[in-house]
């Protein structure tokens, strides 16, 4: 809860415009849009982002090009950089991103590149670190790096397989 805010911000994960409407109608302040929830979440299409943006609830869009780990090669980072630009251009208010090195540390260069793509597309875009933090070698140390990178939000399950288990 921010200063002057009377209640916490409610963000609900959705996979469709219909889900975004339900979230809006039940008091969501914003939605996080992705596809492939059973795979840990994947980047939705530009058309899906547009349809969710049309609902009117601010959307944060997950940018993740494949299931599995969060260690991405140069080709995948280039793809996700293009996806960041695409989802912002399609109406996303922000992106949910992340990348780790093979050693389990935050891939600062990749995260900075994705952040830069978002802010070039929209200087007001919010950039959130996703659940890569939950499998990082040092989650607390990883979180400490985020302010210097300009990331102000973290999507986490508290290090557990599901958020309810990590509370």
Regions found by a protein language model. Give the residues of each.
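N-terminal amphipathic alpha-helix/helix-capping segment at the start of soluble metabolic enzymes
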Residues: 1-13, 17, 53
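Active-site-adjacent beta->alpha loops and helix N-cap segments on the catalytic face
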Residues: 17-18, 37-57, 72-79, 99-122, ...
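Ordered, amphipathic secondary-structure segments that act as subunit-interaction surfaces
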Residues: 82-99
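Glycine-enriched alpha-helix->loop->beta-strand junction motifs that scaffold or abut catalytic
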Residues: 25-34, 55-59, 91-94, 119-124, ...
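A short acidic, helix-capping loop that chelates divalent metal ions and anchors anionic groups
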Residues: 66-72
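Conserved, mostly hydrophobic/aromatic
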Residues: 23, 87, 114, 130, ...
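Hydrophobic faces of well-ordered beta-strands that scaffold small-molecule active sites
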Residues: 8-14, 31-33, 59-63, 95-97, ...
């Amino acid at each position: 809860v921010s200063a002057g805010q009377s209640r916490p911000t409610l963000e609900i994960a959705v996979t469709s415009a219909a889900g975004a409407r339900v979230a809006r109608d039940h008091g969501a302040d914003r939605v996080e849009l992705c596809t492939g929830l059973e795979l840990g979440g994947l980047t939705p299409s530009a058309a899906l982002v547009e349809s969710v943006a049309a609902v009117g609830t601010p959307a944060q869009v997950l940018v993740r090009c494949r299931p599995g780990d969060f260690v991405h090669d140069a080709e995948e980072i280039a793809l996700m950089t293009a996806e960041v630009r695409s989802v912002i251009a399609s109406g996303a208010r922000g992106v949910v991103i992340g990348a780790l090195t093979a050693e389990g540390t935050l891939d600062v260069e990749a995260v900075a590149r994705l952040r830069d793509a978002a802010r070039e597309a929209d200087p007001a875009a919010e950039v959130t670190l996703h659940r890569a933090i939950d499998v990082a070698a040092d989650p607390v140390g990883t979180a400490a790096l985020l302010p210097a990178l300009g990331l102000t939000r973290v999507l986490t399950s508290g290090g557990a397989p599901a958020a309810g288990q990590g509370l």
